[in-house]
């Protein structure tokens, strides 16, 4: 597969149904390799990556979506953030022994799925969904049924292709209600899409996948959108965080530890500050008092 980390939107010309297809390679590897996650957590993050990419593709405005799983199980938190530019990042928190079955409820325990939509202009929206389905895809289908009241079906897969981790998924969604009932059309397309195999999703070009699934239907495929891992951490952000603390307290930490190490959980980057760095940072701050929390 030559073109990786792409999201395709497509439309059925004879049906009131739209679709999305995403395939992730480098983005998935960036997320799971940052923390050397166990296989079960890698799989969960891969599913969340696919879900977040498909969800952000539904945005009709500039903004971001955060898809978060949290509960009392071994995986306390798993979260992916993505924006309308298909820039994704994510992290997970886990402790103790992980169940070998890797099932959603086994990993999260008693928990919930939280979807937060944050437009650049306008109010933030948050939906909280019970983990009342066996899979993340099933939980998201319930979310769409409750929030948008549109028939939606998702296929989310993670695995390996030629020894490398891959994640991919498909979303089918009925268009807003028209005067006629198109449920039979949606069911027809759902049955076709359900024949997709993991090796096809991971190894074939998107155009070939869509042809294999829907070659008897007229499908309009739009230009793909690149998907990428993007972390917003920087040394400047770390400096801003340090400036929120009293200078003497920061210097005490340096004296005790030798230096301050700040670690980004999203990308694994390390930022170090020694005594000279701290003195320089506070000396060039325009107004030290204005940068402190009281």
From Swiss-Prot:
Compartment(s): Cytoplasm
Entry-linked InterPro entries: Heat_shock_Hsp33, Heat_shock_Hsp33_C, Heat_shock_Hsp33_N, Hsp33_helix_hairpin_bin_dom_sf
Keyword DNA repair found: no
Example of a GO MF term: protein folding chaperone
PANTHER family, sorted: 33 KDA CHAPERONIN
HAMAP family recorded: HslO
Protein name, as recorded: 33 kDa chaperonin
Gene that produces this protein: hslO
